[in-house]
A protein has these predicted regions:
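ABC ATPase nucleotide-binding domains
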Residues: 187-209
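Conserved ABC transporter NBD signature motif
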Residues: 7-18
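ABC-family P-loop ATPase nucleotide-binding domains
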Residues: 35-91
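H-loop/switch region of ABC-family ATPase nucleotide-binding domains
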Residues: 150-151
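Conserved catalytic motifs of ABC-family nucleotide-binding domains
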Residues: 109
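Catalytic Walker B motif of ABC-type/P-loop ATPase nucleotide-binding domains
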Residues: 113-117
Length: 209
C-alpha cells in the first residue's frame, strides 16, 4: 500500500498508483509478520491458506471451490505440514506458522513471491526446515520470480541467483549472488571484517581473524 515520494514503482509491468490493486494482488504472493499478526489464533490452517484465493484472511463467506481446497492441501503437504488442515493457528509452532504463511503466499500461483524475513524468530531446527522448503521452491523450474529479505546469509536457500546488499538504506552492491555476497562487500556493509563462505550450497559469514 506504500507509494514512493519520488519516482515510480513498477511491478509486473504495472505502475503503482495507475493499476487496480485488487487486480494486481493475486499476481503477488507475500509472506510477512504483518500478515501473520492479523490471523486469529482460532483460525484453521486450511482456511488461512485457501482464503488467499479471495485475498482475505480466514474463513470466506462463500463455499470454497473443490479445486482451491485441493490446492491448499497440496501446498501444505509440500511445506511438510501433512494432516494440519484442521489445526488452529494458535497451536502451531513458530516454524509451522512460517510454512503456512508461505503456502498461503503460493495459493494463487503468483508471478512474484515476496518473503520478508521468513526465518525471523526461528530456532535452528525451524530455520533448517524452512530453508529446505525454500530450496525446493527456488530450484523448481516452474517457481515464480522470488524476492527474499534476510539479515543472515545462513538463511539463503539454494536456487538464489542474484543478491542486493543494503546498508543504512542505500544499495551498496547488486548482481549475481556469487560476485555480490563477497567478504569485501559484506565487511563494508556490516562495518566489520567478515569472511564469507559458500559450501555445499549454503552461505555463511563469520568474523575474520
Amino acid at each position: 500500500q506504500l507509494h514512493p515520494t519520488v519516482g515510480l514503482v513498477e511491478i509486473l509491468d504495472e505502475i503503482l498508483g495507475a493499476v487496480d490493486v485488487f487486480e494486481l494482488r493475486p499476481r503477488i504472493g507475500m509472506a510477512s509478520s504483518a500478515l501473520a499478526h492479523r490471523i486469529p489464533e482460532s483460525e484453521k490452517v486450511g482456511n488461512i491458506v485457501v482464503s488467499a484465493a479471495w485475498a482475505v484472511v480466514g474463513r470466506w463467506r462463500e463455499a470454497y471451490d473443490e479445486q482451491d481446497v485441493a490446492r491448499a492441501g497440496s501446498l501444505l503437504e509440500r511445506m511438510g505440514l501433512v494432516g494440519m488442515v484442521d489445526r488452529t493457528w494458535g497451536t502451531l509452532s513458530e516454524g509451522e506458522c512460517k510454512r503456512v504463511e508461505i503456502a498461503r503466499a503460493l495459493m494463487t500461483d503468483p508471478e512474484l513471491l515476496l518473503l520478508d524475513e521468513p526465518a525471523a524468530g526461528l530456532d535452528l531446527a525451524g530455520r533448517e526446515q524452512l530453508v529446505e522448503v525454500l530450496s525446493a521452491i527456488f530450484t523448481d523450474p516452474d517457481a515464480p520470480a522470488s524476492v527474499l529479505v534476510t539479515h543472515h546469509l545462513e538463511e539463503i536457500p539454494a536456487g538464489v541467483t542474484h543478491a542486493l546488499v543494503m546498508a543504512e538504506g542505500r544499495i551498496v552492491a547488486a548482481g549475481p549472488v556469487e560476485t555480490t555476497l563477497t567478504s569485501e562487500v559484506l565487511s563494508g556493509a556490516f562495518g566489520m571484517p567478515l569472511t564469507v563462505s559458500h559450501v555445499d550450497g549454503r552461505w555463511n559469514a563469520r568474523a575474520a581473524h
